[in-house]
């Protein structure tokens, strides 16, 4: 082979040293089986990518990409790639090292320097280095060995999305620096900030829980906008509309996700008395929000985004449903803002009875937005009588079932608008003493009141369930309890520390101290336990886990209230009356006049907790289950409560394109001695194992993918969790059918089972692209292309 020189970071050249590379690969294989064969495999394939003048950065990337090409054959290569990427991060930020002990010492030595330098450059808050923290003690706690818990996608996601960078874009944080920076940034107000930061760090660095994206990006930073979710309701006047655009821009800039309610805006054609003209209606103003989202720079890490909400009695609701359609007037379409419909029980009952549904101009029916449950139904019927008697300027009516099908047809085509239920949200709310909840947030899991003086905010952490399941398939309940309580305290601290340039958001945050503790990794733990997602065992486990976490989250908030005081609007809340989330199920049944079909069995001492919460609660809300798409990558687990989308698929993210192979499936098939013989067949079937002979039925049941499960399983899982969750749940739906009548049944069942919200609808594609693999004749490639500067796949043969 022609001599190859490597250009080092200082510009000097040195001959390519295969032994040096092989040693690095071997070290990355530590603890894995067949280490030598893995090194040989990677080293052989690496030869094809080398060229004279390759830089050390290019060489590092070439090694990693070569390793990743083999993930399809053995997921162990993902671990190797993660370790190699981590080594490049360490070298770039800390310098060279040889042993794990040296790496730990480098972390301890460099962390205080990093904090002080970042504060000096204005990247970190001055409080990080003002003496309240013992930086040496914190640095001594850093444990880079915990980075080995991460998969490759987790490492690259943290590096590209969450790690602190200089203004020139160069990263200055290792993963453990990131964890500690976040822990410190959420401990300023503790009596012993160092001890608190160490506790938070230990939970986060062990991936027991992960804060929401905005917190990960901004904690400890010079402008700590840490809240994840913002909910604002637009009033029917120009000042409110203009302010909503401004507020949207500020929130998006700070990486927050936004829910925006537009139901109050008068309909198109409605008189505008001040100018003696007619209103253009809410749709053009929604377009303004959409444009603002596109225009704002969002730190280049975590994109800000919004969901626009409207109740379906609005006269312009038909145009609202079309907002996400690809065709039509572009000025009446939103390309960046999502849409969601806020649905009343009255509408769902009319769908069931096949009755008419009336649409009104909010200018003539302004109180409907503030009413819910029985009060809404009574007032709505009064407006119907007024309309039919000619006492309203304008109205429209359609069969309720027809409108429902219209919504669901759009949902099938565009995955919008998402379906959320106003009355279920408000009747079951424990914090509705401060007003009506008019909408949810970007991801449909936050349910907080908002008005002109309050832009509701919520702060998120998600518990990684898989971190508490032992190898022997037992649960570490004590550690889960500790993590839940620590997460609540961490989130409560966040309420005092977070900043935003919007006074109404700061006011709401201080008045409610709302937090949302969620879960992720459900599908991951079900697979490890051998439970099918649609089994009774799975449903009971979801029930048990969410009850346990809810109980200890509520208990911790009550303890914090005793220590620090209740949130300011506690008096008059459901909590102050000793009402808990599980108690509101009967309240909802009474309001509907029909029993909500939710299993209400309990396992813990809820009577004792009822007495305790009457005395005080630190937070208006405690739980909300977010989708966790990105922080799930960081934790190396499955998102939220979703099933596996597929066992093998290509994932495209802002961080690149990655091949995802279900490690649990590979592990189980390896135990049965089936993986090596069947992996090609599994790839040919695009990861679908249901029709592959030789795989036991129990394995097939456990590894059903989202489109192979009954949609009623998604509803059952969410219903079991929702009874314990005081806010809501991001419930993605996956349907194989395109029958709209079946959609009506499914979403009606979701309402009957007490779900507060749903999120995206994913419909199984009609066609799947043909898969190919690339087989390379390595010997021919090396012999013939020896004079080529860049080697690649010139002699590749396509296998179909």
Segments predicted by a language model, with ranges:
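Extended catalytic cores of very large enzyme megasubunits
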Residues: 1-800
